[in-house]
Amino acid sequence: MSGNIGANPVIIIGCASAYAVEFNKDLIEAEDRENVNLSQFETDGQLPVGKYSLSTLINNKRTPIHLDLQWVLIDNQTAVCVTPEQLTLLGFTDEFIEKTQQNLIDGCYPIEKEKQITTYLDKGKMQLSISAPQAWLKYKDANWTPPELWNHGIAGAFLDYNLYASHYAPHQGDNSQNISSYGQAGVNLGAWRLRTDYQYDQSFNNGKSQATNLDFPRIYLFRPIPAMNAKLTIGQYDTESSIFDSFHFSGISLKSDENMLPPDLRGYAPQITGVAQTNAKVTVSQNNRIIYQENVPPGPFAITNLFNTLQGQLDVKVEEEDGRVTQWQVASNSIPYLTRKGQIRYTTAMGKPTSVGGDSLQQPFFWTGEFSWGWLNNVSLYGGSVLTNRDYQSLAAGVGFNLNSLGSLSFDVTRSDAQLHNQDKETGYSYRANYSKRFESTGSQLTFAGYRFSDKNFVTMNEYINDTNHYTNYQNEKESYIVTFNQYLESLRLNTYVSLARNTYWDASSNVNYSLSLSRDFDIGPLKNVSTSLTFSRINWEEDNQDQLYLNISIPWGTSRTLSYGMQRNQDNEISHTASWYDSSDRNNSWSVSASGDNDEFKDMKASLRASYQHNTENGRLYLSGTSQRDSYYSLNASWNGSFTATRHGAAFHDYSGSADSRFMIDADGTEDIPLNNKRAVTNRYGIGVIPSVSSYITTSLSVDTRNLPENVDIENSVITTTLTEGAIGYAKLDTRKGYQIIGVIRLADGSHPPLGISVKDETSHKELGLVADGGFVYLNGIQDDNKLALRWGDKSCFIQPPNSSNLTTGTAILPCISQN
């Protein structure tokens, strides 16, 4: 009968229904049908009386917690029994929980007493699925997790860092070098998070240090307050406002956090586009604090992953490798400020304005606050104020409309009362309108984000701060607007993008920035998905216009290689050409080579030759690039970004984690090279791995890549579900089974075999290592040298001392099971 040994137990288990059954042992092809113990398989959904740790699903949605659930005896059957606290964690309404109070059994409620609730227990996964009417559950959005299930993580510390180095050597003149770094360090304790931003820059001339700057733009403490759907921040921070300009301050703030709510309007972040003329470094900053930095190759670039919490003016700087610098500003005004009916969103802060780095300024104490109230289904009222104990006050009021098929629209008016240095107190007004509309039928998006007109006497808080500290280089804004339009024409496979931003000033010349981009994919014979793009842009900064026209054609060469040609014309009508080859056939190693120059440079063999290489590891990302132009210059650039996280359970270097993101530490109990989340992270020699950039307030499943485990390693809990709060360091310990496998036959002292279906467990850890099949056959995994294995059935038990790995032979091992009764 040995040929059926491996299949029969599976068939038996699969026949179990949701009710108690008694197996017909005559159907079992076993040598001794009476010597069979299938009690643990006879009732699906039942467990012996006791308490068990289970993962849970509610209406097919996995919850991010394990519950210690009780099984109690009711009508000669066991049933799951849930405490009121556990019902709250599972998301049941207060009304339902109150109704169960009259029928508690030893402090818990057998939920299957409710005819509309069904449960299913997967014993193999130790997972309980609960199906309940949606009306009995508080939360109806499948993409959001309620506060009761949020995880604040564990105590720990981290460092997220970005390192840059460059060397520029002209054919004539001095060499220059630069070393820079920016990032964030943090410490977590419970729900509290301590954070400090840092930025370091050192320049050299012929190897001699010229200037060194080290700043800590922000040092602050924050924590989520779930009961208020808000975040509390204490320290050096920036005001967060959809009405007023942002400024740096030291003090305390409280802000409602949209991410704690079910999905709704969750803010807006701008897309920054531009054209780099060489290998360039793009820096986005606000209030002199670096927000984003990236190396980009020559040609158009787009930055689309800025945080949606950014408000106000953003400064963009493009530093070309030959020393040229281009600067402009981008507004990050929010789309119309709408709130669902009956809800209030708010932010408030108080303290004293400071410069970046915390330098003391001669500034007044201030308080600022704003709100948005959902008055009607499609109408929101909003407003705010900035109040000081000196000569500046500002008030704002506005209304936002959801016009349904016509889009979204808002209007607001802001009044300022300010007395600037050596001037009389003046009252000024600023008027603003926002509009956004997506045309579903055509797939186009129109955003008129922020027409604003300010009279000459209107003063912002930033302007008042600058004037009080005798900074005279600020501009008195008169009018500004931003328009963006995006349209995809499916029939032509053509995408269009247009953006226009205009600013005028009372005391300075105006500037207009605009960009037009057309892109299309098409096929040429055997060449599929050939991509072309045409981009025209104008950047106006301090009365200097920079016009650029860029044409690019990219031809895919297979699935991971690209041949490209680009043509660029600048404001002086100079035309340059670039030919490049990009190869990403290795997911962790990509490289490119290119040649660029104008017609004369190619003719004289003086085109610029560039090469770049990027290497992705579990511990960070390395980027190298170099450029050389004969008789002109050469340059070298290098960057590395990564993170380091430490807790009481261990520490690990890992891939870069954004400062606003959470992270998750996996403890594999000392087992190295466990791949996590599709090899996004791997455990180190101490068994510790960190998965970076885990979303906050969203149920996230983190997994072990079980197909690529090291030899002789098994993982029981290969999927971990969690919902982390902002900035949390999550933690889970894997049930790692490390050891060798044994295929054998268990024999008792009298030559018989243990009953079919008995578990074989490690005597020390009590982990199940296998099940007894027909004729005592067993497959065991996770065996360690000198393990002692135990089998128990009824009032009987026996123990196995398996052979050590060094004594294993091929074939089936005989495993004597010795009774110690």
From Swiss-Prot:
Signal peptide: 1-20
Disulfide bonds: 798-817
One GO term describing the cellular component: cell outer membrane
GO terms under biological process: pilus assembly
InterPro entries registered for this protein in UniProt: Fimb_usher, Fimbrial_membr_usher_CS, FimD_plug_dom, PapC-like_C, PapC-like_C_sf, PapC_N, PapC_N_sf
Domain of life: Bacteria
Principal subcellular localisation of the protein: membrane
GO molecular function, one term: fimbrial usher porin activity
Compartments where located: Cell outer membrane
Keyword Repressor listed: no
Bilayer topology: Multi-pass membrane protein
Keyword field contains Protein biosynthesis: no
Disruption phenotype: Loss of H(2) production on minimal glucose and complex glucose but not on complex formate medium. Alters production of organic acids when grown on minimal glucose medium. This phenotype was complemented by reintroduction of the yqiG gene.
Keywords: Cell outer membrane, Disulfide bond, Fimbrium biogenesis, Membrane, Signal, Transmembrane, Transmembrane beta strand, Transport
Protein purpose: May be involved in H(2) production during fermentative growth. Involved in the export and assembly of a fimbrial subunit across the outer membrane.
Protein family per UniProt: Belongs to the fimbrial export usher family.
Full protein name: Putative outer membrane usher protein YqiG
Species of provenance: Escherichia coli (strain K12)
